[in-house]
Amino acid sequence: MQKVHVIAHTHWDFEWYFTRQQARVQFAYHMAEVLQALADNQLDSYLLDGQLAIVDDYLQTNPDKRAAMMRFVKARRLFIGPWYTQIDEMVTSGEAIVRNLQLGHKLAADLGGVMKVGYLPDSFGQGQDMPKIYQGFDITATVFWRGMPHEKNARYFYWTASDGSKVLAANIKNGYYVGVDLIENDDTAALLHRIATDTQAHDLALPVGGDQRAVDFNLKDRLQYANQQTSDFELVEDNYPDFFKALSTSSDLPTYQGEFIDPSASKIHRGIYSSRADLKHLYDRLEHLMVDVVEPMMVIAAHQGIEAQDGMVAHIWRAIARGQAHDSSGGCNSDATNQDIYQRGVEALQLAESVRDYLLRKLASGAPASLNVFFEAHQRCGPFIKMVRSRWQRVASIFHLKMKMVKSSRMKS
């Protein structure tokens, strides 16, 4: 008998063919249902789509619900994180992916705990370095849907990166919405045999939820009905961390390496790689400005006694993270939504440029004569700001060099 771990969840794009403002209104009412279902024990647990952006928006307008959320998070009944937004891996830089996870982890920890599962149920293809990135955050398991080719057809497997990093992966081949049939269709056998294909594992995952779907308050009744209809499967309410703990005892799981960007089993929407190039250019420019210029300058400034503006940096990275959600970065949205995305990017870029310009003026005009910091050049480097002081002028120049701080005597003029 195989064990089916039934996982109640929502998939909640914070913007798509609807605007962020429309989504915020609907999510506020959805959270009322979630908290009620958990308080009344109509659900054992619930997954908020693995992202904190929707929670961030919700708590801005519903701060009185923070305590209730924290109570359920700490009790391992409400699962949040590890992401800030549900990114697209193929049009997002590696640094932005890491920052997205950092932000998601921080906010989830502040609310009581982060779900240590790399949960990306709708990202349009899977990057080859994701196991490496996940291991850097002590994430040992991942859930995704899109990109698996027919020749690599295992539902559950170990996914490795080129450096040997490994995570246990669940490919939800039938989509994150497959479990809706458990609620709306009495043909339980057909559903269970569908999710049992391409695996010999004893433990199976059955996600129950969908895009902006209302809470299924009758889940327990439907589980009872399903268990009465089958002798081949046992269905239990569960969550992804406990599912992976059970799955990890399987001894016959295959190992795959590399990226998964094949549309043979699920759509990966290749058109999003080039659609709305204006958005992609804007956010790419913003990412590079932060990573290659603003943050290095802030380090230099801090060395000279100029206080770092960590809150401002975090604010800009929040805007970047919202621009890297899979629909937002893909530009596959309504015109109104794309206008919102573009305007957020413009405002964040203006803020980043203002930080850069201020620090440049401050450093160029006020660097002490005894400035004792310089930077060595290395190959394979990114740009940084090198401050050159001479007897007659102070010049700020951008070189394509790697930043490395070393001790030095006073620079010669």
Place the predicted regions along the sequence by residue:
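Catalytic-domain carbohydrate-binding cleft regions of carbohydrate-active enzymes
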Residues: M1-I385, Q393-S413
